[in-house]
Amino acid sequence: DDQTIWQRRTSIERYVSQLGIADVMPTTHLAFYTDTTYGMRYWTYISEELPKICREFFPQMSDKKEDNLAAGLSMGGYGAWKLGLGASETFGAAASLSGCLDIIEDVGRHLEGDSRDAALFRGIYGSLEQLEGSDNDLMALAKKLKTSGKPIPRLYSWCGTEDFLYEGNKRAWEYMKEHGIQEIIVHAPYIINLGNAV
């Protein structure tokens, strides 16, 4: 599936239609919202170009960060937090639904070897050394933002206790708490999918 699943399999259009909310659903394919080592500039597109284009096409869209939220499921949850932490001047909040929040543990282990996943993730991030501590590492990005003294967006995280990403979410939650970054955490005894997310 791709970003269109939200329109096809949820009621999101019905929810936002009466609220005056612009619901923008871009794709970065399998590139994890990253300017990849193979040259695709998905991060630049999603964090800089897309907001500008949307506001040019729809001038009534607010450019106030408090009016802009990034949200996503799974890889999109990682992308949402990355937008919140890495483009905090644009996004005032970020919501991750069963997101890949500990990229070092959840993806980093796939960077070694000759598997299809290893080739995919090396094409995105390069080596584990290049990934760890970079702006693609959400925990390093949070620390960088906190150190800068800039306002930190509201962070929301929802992950089922049976989800394979749950342990990574717990590590991210603990890290944020240790570093004084507030977030809203919801976890429940199931796996999150579109049927119970929206």
Predicted features, each with a name:
Residues 1-198:
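Non-catalytic cap/lid and distal C-terminal segments of serine-dependent acyl enzymes
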